[in-house]
Structure formats: structure tokens, C-alpha cells
Amino acid sequence: MWEARAEYADGSTVERYFSERPGIEEAEQQYLLECWLLDRHPDCTWYSVNYINE
């Protein structure tokens, strides 16, 4: 499972969990989630993407 979190300049935050997607390597999955966080809002001030062992 993946955890994606971000904070934005206007004070809004997002925290969401994602299941693993078969056939996608770990680095690619992390990159896709980072892009998702950055595309949600133009002024991202902080973000984190972590893999969580269940």
C-alpha cells in the first residue's frame, strides 16, 4: 500500500492511500503518485510518498 501526502500554499492538505498496481515497478509507482500530488494544486509546498508494508 502507498501513502501520498501533500501540503499546499493555501493551507489545504491531501492524504490518500493507494493499493499496489500489478506490473508497475516501485520507482514508477512512486513517480506517478508524486506527479498526482503536484498536479492537484499549483502551489505545493511539501509532499511525501511512502510505501507501507501491511
Each language-model region and where it sits:
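Intrinsic low-complexity/disordered segments
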Residues: 26-27, 38
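A structural detector for beta-sheet-dominated domains
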Residues: 7, 19, 50-52
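Amphipathic alpha-helical segments in structured regions that serve as interaction surfaces
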Residues: 27-33
